[in-house]
């Protein structure tokens, strides 16, 4: 069986935000044109927020709120890819590296498949992993609930870390 000192860890992240018409939509570090943005203290990038939680969680090092509290003014309108980069540095200092990530965005619009490759390219450098180790896909909520009513979106992310 696996020993407690196994060099692999898995983390699960989640984030959701409501749409807000007076902001740009930023997902996966890119701006999605012609779509309402996401409410949030930082830039509202739910993909990067879910990835931060997955990565920090896998290393047992907290979450987006403990490292970048919404009560602190310095994180207001922050670029979430910078927060993700900071989180990768945190796990690196503790001897961990990202092996791969898998992201599912749940929304009626935008159509995630149209932007997934650009998101993967953007996040590859931030996560310090090859593009082929990043999966980003979209699912609808089939018109059900607040997501189905296009009031916002939700993101699930899984990260695999390896001890260096």
Each model region followed by its residue ranges:
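RNase III-family endoribonuclease catalytic core
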Residues: 2-117, 126-127
